[in-house]
Amino acid sequence: MRSMSKCILGLCAGLAGLSLLAGSAEAQFKNGSQPTELNIPRVSQRGSVTQRIGLTDITINYHRPAVGGREIWGKIVPYGKVWRAGANENTTVTFTDDVTVEGKPLVAGTYGLHTIPDKDQWTIIFSKNSTSWGSFSYDEKEDALRVTVKPHPAELFEQLAYTFEDVKPDSAVATLRWEKLALPFQIGVDVKAVVLRSVKNELRN
């Protein structure tokens, strides 16, 4: 029993140490310095989801913070301030072809995803900077696109997640889900134009 207790205590101490190291790394990023990258388990696990529309792949890479009994909206995530829409490094969205988001055009590429939450309306920001740590170094000058959407009450999601819903031949709704909130935004693709371009490229080769 004593040896088992020692093992459990040692494991708890090790996990606590890892959390402190991760917290230290994040604090250094907040201060603008670049810490040595540590390959350690994250408290907020990495997640990724991909949806294909026609020939176009849309991939969201993010980290998944947990509610953990906390008051999220307006507290952990303040209203009126830029939020990284996840945890740790930038949440990123990659489009393999040009798309529209909420009807507004956005060229193919990888973008840092940020939001500005509010009670009744959120701003979703696609930034040309996709490699920063969260939103701490966010610069409005690097915006590629901003759209406004409305949040909706939803079933509880203990860990933050992104999903694709209402998938159609030329569109899908990407949704951020966390706590009891869902934030949907529609992504559209000109499938005919993408297919025509693909066929032309194949004929050239």
Write out the residue ranges for each language-model feature.
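Bacterial N-terminal signal peptides that target proteins for export
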Residues: M1-G14
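Hydrophobic core
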Residues: L15-L20
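Sec/Tat signal peptide C-region and signal peptidase I cleavage site
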Residues: L21-A27
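Extended, well-structured beta-strand/loop surface patches
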Residues: Q28, S33, N39, D57-A108, ...
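An ectodomain-focused feature that recognizes extracytoplasmic/extracellular
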Residues: R42-R52, I60-N61
